[in-house]
Amino acid sequence: MAKITRALISVSDKTGIVEFSRELAGYGVEILSTGGTAKLLREAGLKVKDVSEFTGFPEMLDGRVKTLHPKVHGGLLGMRGNPEHVATMKAHGIEPIDMVVVNLYPFEATVAKPDCTLEDAIENIDIGGPTMLRSAAKNNADVTVVVDHNDYRLVLDEMKAAGGGVSKETNFRLAVKVYQHTAAYDGAISNWLGARTGEGVAAYPDTLTLQFKKAQGMRYGENPHQSAAFYVERDVKEASVATARQLQGKELSYNNIGDTDAALECVKQFAEGPGCVIVKHANPCGVAIGDTLLDAYDRAYKTDPESAFGGIIAFNGELDEATAKAIVERQFVEVIIAPKVSAKASEVVAAKKNVRLLECGTWQKEPMPRLDFKRVNGGLLVQYTDLALHGELKVVTKRAPTEKEMIDLLFTWRVAKFVKSNAIVYGKDGMTIGVGAGQMSRVNSARIAAIKAEHAGLPVAGSVMASDAFFPFRDGLDNAAAVGITAVIQPGGSMRDEEVIAAADEHGMAMVFTSMRHFRH
């Protein structure tokens, strides 16, 4: 490999750049630079040649044109092993540039500011930086290109081991990273500007560019005959299954990740006390809050012990020794996830070496808006995640719910939001009594919820019921009354609302409309 003799350095993020440049200088590397980077390096006592001196052409247009010059791009793109390239470079006085260290104007950080104007955004679109990066990356056989300060040490270590050069294999990997970076950069620009082609700002741009990074290969997907991988967003800003740290256990499977996400996002809804959610096939089969985490787990498990077998368990507080012990002694579990796991709890779970134990960190009270995607053949459905809980709450029956009933209604309503439609949830005293999920008719979901409660030995009488969407007929209310439901919460909005309200009044039930539906498919 050839020794690096000249590097062009121009960075917006100056993390570690002085130290990196100092070590390059120690190998005799000539440093070319521009603007603020050159100033910083000189102040650190390093010898720097301005790019304008190197090219013989001044910076102009308020700094918009600095490096867009044949002496720069010829020095990057010229193939050292091509005699014609070498002769052309020599004829035009073009000297080779062996390394480019560039990161780009902070476009995403700029447009994230609430007071960002179109002019601000435009001025933070980097032109020279991506051009140099792409030129260097294209000629990676001869040029080392560094776009991430986390790679400085990798490059220096290799130069030290190789006497001042970097291997072609490393150059190739760094070049791939450049194209990933510039693709994301251009995608962010396209998305932001594409939402502003008409009047005002559109919720969705004309074209949508997404980038996810491969986090994990998988043995198979949803089924053994399907291949799969797990990709994560570049910058996840909240606690999630994508950011969770695995403390022990087998590698997470495709289904594990989907179910763990469902469990974690559901348990985040409950901030009033220790909470537990048990999920099977992306549906909550038991949800509870309690005086302690152990109490919450006990109550969630009692909803449906049969379905909890092989399930995913999520908590909203630190997993403690007592709760961990109860889980491993009571049931087979695929995944346990919590914001934090105590050392004692980790020791307990370690007895079951295949159990996947995840620590996700704490989350903020108000969730961050984000996009949801659903792939269809030939397209992509895009919507904002369902983060709202309810609209205006309206008591529509003669009898208003008691204070206790209202607490239980809001509890079951939060659970119903995470149950596959058609969803019916029976609950009482901060725990689910029965869950009816995924049925084509709403009344059948209600029947299943009652069957589940009976099978678990839990009395339905005195419980409340939540429905993710309106009741199209009164039969759902009649069925609920027959098993002892005393209050109902649902969106309302059916053509037969009056008939449904009349049924509730006949049975002496209280009913609340939420003015918001929560279909989940």
UniProtKB/Swiss-Prot annotation:
PROSITE patterns: MGS. GO terms for cellular component: cytosol. It catalyses: (6R)-10-formyltetrahydrofolate + 5-amino-1-(5-phospho-beta-D-ribosyl)imidazole-4-carboxamide = 5-formamido-1-(5-phospho-D-ribosyl)imidazole-4-carboxamide + (6S)-5,6,7,8-tetrahydrofolate; IMP + H2O = 5-formamido-1-(5-phospho-D-ribosyl)imidazole-4-carboxamide. Pathway: Purine metabolism; IMP biosynthesis via de novo pathway; 5-formamido-1-(5-phospho-D-ribosyl)imidazole-4-carboxamide from 5-amino-1-(5-phospho-D-ribosyl)imidazole-4-carboxamide (10-formyl THF route): step 1/1; Purine metabolism; IMP biosynthesis via de novo pathway; IMP from 5-formamido-1-(5-phospho-D-ribosyl)imidazole-4-carboxamide: step 1/1. Its EC number is 2.1.2.3, 3.5.4.10. It comes from the Bacteria. Coiled coil: none annotated. Keywords: Hydrolase, Multifunctional enzyme, Purine biosynthesis, Transferase. One of its GO terms (biological process) is 'de novo' IMP biosynthetic process. GO terms for molecular function: IMP cyclohydrolase activity; phosphoribosylaminoimidazolecarboxamide formyltransferase activity. Residues 1-147 form the MGS-like domain. Transmembrane segments: none annotated. The keyword Ribosomal protein does not apply. The keyword Hydrolase applies. It holds the Pfam family MGS. Belongs to the PurH family. The IMP cyclohydrolase activity resides in the N-terminal region. NCBIfam families: PRK00881.1, purH. This is Bifunctional purine biosynthesis protein PurH. It comes from Geotalea uraniireducens (strain Rf4). The lineage of its organism: Bacteria, Pseudomonadati, Thermodesulfobacteriota, Desulfuromonadia, Geobacterales.
